[in-house]
Amino acid sequence: SDFTGYALRTFVSPNGTLRTVIAGCASGPTQWERVDWSADTPPGTSVSLRVRTATTEADLAMARWVGPFRDRPSELELPPGPVSGERFAELELTLDSGGTMTSPRIDRLTVQYNCPL
């Protein structure tokens, strides 16, 4: 029998998350504009994004999540945003297999922001 196939269907999580912290403008407030990603999303799978911001990296743990954003690129100033203009942003990408035997894969993540004068 093929225990590998059984193990993949039985013991591997069908969903996953990827989190990363981005430091915005060194001078402080940051206008978070857009997040885009390149992904392989087989039929039935999906990728969504949540964002939270804080003045310090340590304060991110207590910040409120905004999202999920499902479109790419995700305009962070539009619903379900806007994302507040704090210096640090934490991005959380959720990869969902949708109950299929395949998973999405992220190839690239791009964050666009502006530093107000």
Task: Annotate each predicted stretch with a short phrase.
Residues 1-117:
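Beta-strand-rich ligand- or partner-binding modules
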